[in-house]
Amino acid sequence: MAGKRKARKLPLVQTEAILPDLQSCVLCEDVRCEFNGMQTLVGVLNIVPTPKLPVNYMRLCIWTRWCSGAGRFHQRSKIVGPDDNLTIAQAEVDFDLKQMEGHATNVHYFGGVQFQQFGLHHVEIYLGDELRLRFPLPVIEVKPPSA
């Protein structure tokens, strides 16, 4: 059968990105990479209790996982103050999702984060210019234990 060629499937050319879902987002004090490639989130935060201000964190991390999308994307993560005007910490990263079944995990490390006000702060996650997630982070005053 000279002249006959075996048909082969060509990869699909993707012209438009398929926006991913934000599967998970966690604010924590550290992210460790274990020997098996898994990640361990340390000191998960949902509130910042403090007897006085300012309160400092040597390190804070925002861990995100995106799935069910395809294309190249830009993520911006922010921690904003109670008035929504003050950005306390911000980081950005570009990432790729090559296939719909895949996922992308991003970790933003912030050093020397300082909260100078009590009140309801927020963590914000943007995909491009679109706000995809916003959750509260209360900084509250706690009385030190009496002696």
Give the ranges of each region predicted by the language model.
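Contiguous segments within soluble domain cores/interaction surfaces
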Residues: 2-147
